[in-house]
Amino acid sequence: MSRKFNVNGVCYPDEHYMVNIDSKLAEIKELVDEKQYFVINRARQYGKTTTLNLLVKYLADQYTVFFISFEGLGGTAFETEAEFCKTICELLYDAIRYDEVPQIDEAVKAIIKESIEQNKIEDMMSLSATLSEICKNSVAPVVLIIDEVDQASNYKVFIDFLGMLRSKFLKRNTRPTFHSVILAGVYDIKNLKHRIREDREHQMNSPWNIAADFPVDMSFTVEEIEGMLNEYNDEHSCVMLVRECAKTIFEYTSGYPYLVSKICKLIDERCGENWTKQGVSDAVKILLREANPLFDDLRKKITDYPELRAMLYAILFRGESYPYNPDNFAIDIGTMFGFIKEKNGQVVIANRIFETRLYNLFLSEELTSSIIYQSGERDKNQFIKNGVLDMELVLEKFMIHFHDIYGDNTNTFIEENGRRLFLLYLKPIINGTGNYYIEAQTRDQTRTDIIVDYLGKQYVIELKIWHGNEYNKRGEEQLAEYLEYYHLDKGYLLSFNFNKNKQTGLKEIQFGDKTLVEVVV
């Protein structure tokens, strides 16, 4: 059976096309070799479980590795201390029973089996004693990996368990204990504590303050994506510009593992194996239209955390910037969920896919009540001529509707909402056929660059808040430079002008060898 791209559950090298993560495994092994206890807390569908499965094999030559998971455990397992401790022992024995523990000694098997059969595990103290016996009798150093620790996040008994492991860690020079402990989940232990005790005084008091930093970048690089595509190309003998495809996929995903694999899967299965920039764009268009657990989680989290939602909205529609400060709750929680990241000391949306999905989500909340959206819906058929989008006419019509609908509003309203209103007008025009995205690197409070991809043709529209002639001149220069980057000869400038003597309308500007069509509203 030929290999497939996989986005559901664990990936296996003999069944699925995978990025080679040996370099990441080597970095994690360094932490294990150093006897570190640490947490792999990364966003949903970030390849944590697949990485841990491969890590067990990577460590097998030197360590006895117990890899257990809290996934699927019912509430009964956490009801009492005795029940929880018994469950831990049973999970360890299950791993042995199914030959999942490398370098396991018969003495260790006997200790765990006897503890279960004779009901020796009654509380944390007896569990601690059994764990010490396991580590004492194992020939190889013992590593404990626990996946899906979020499942235990609402239970105090799990925090007590962490406290017990911490106590053993602090006494490791005199008492046998685990060589290394790895916990994996979305939440870090500080936030687990917060979920159990809402008291602000206690939310920072983590029982896991022994944990080392986990500096491993688990996102995929262009080179890693390229390696995976080379394997696919070798097996399928298709015509593929591998480097170009890898770079384009990375530009959309910033290496987010699920999104990388999903785009590849869509190209392979639903885009006719069209391994080109256009094929990637087609896959992205499908991806942005579908529901999946990752996008469902994105929507749920910004509903649950209004501070995060407000920050994302301000970044996207008002071009506001936020210095990256992990002590800020919204920034901390947004980073933990993988929606934002730090770049050059500033908060940025984690990737172009999330950014466009958020734009679509926020805009969709206004569609039924937005007059400008309804205007775009009515106008849309007149903009397509011989399969080509007439962007000049789109901007001209938007200018007319904008003055008719919003002409009497204040400058503050226009400055804060102009860009959002243009996106609302544009959305029904390209919906179902084209894509758009915002260039995050150039977005600020006065400028937003929109790139529209419609049937293989790209259009660059720069939206400017205009205060003064000199500022507009710089806008023309910036747009011309951007057109050069995209190898385009024509670009569009939509200016929201706040000068008293402004002249509204459409004009064409020749800037070097570039043609700029400017609409002033």
Regions found by a protein language model. Give the residues of each.
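Acidic-basic catalytic patches of nuclease active cores, encompassing PD-(D/E)XK
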Residues: 394-437
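Nucleic-acid nuclease catalytic cores
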Residues: 472-476, 483-512
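P-loop NTPase nucleotide-binding core
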Residues: 30, 34-46, 50-161, 179, ...
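The catalytic "switch" region of P-loop NTPases
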Residues: 9, 151-244, 251-252, 266, ...
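Conserved catalytic cores of phosphodiester-cleaving nucleases, focusing on short active-site segments
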Residues: 422, 450-452, 456-467, 482
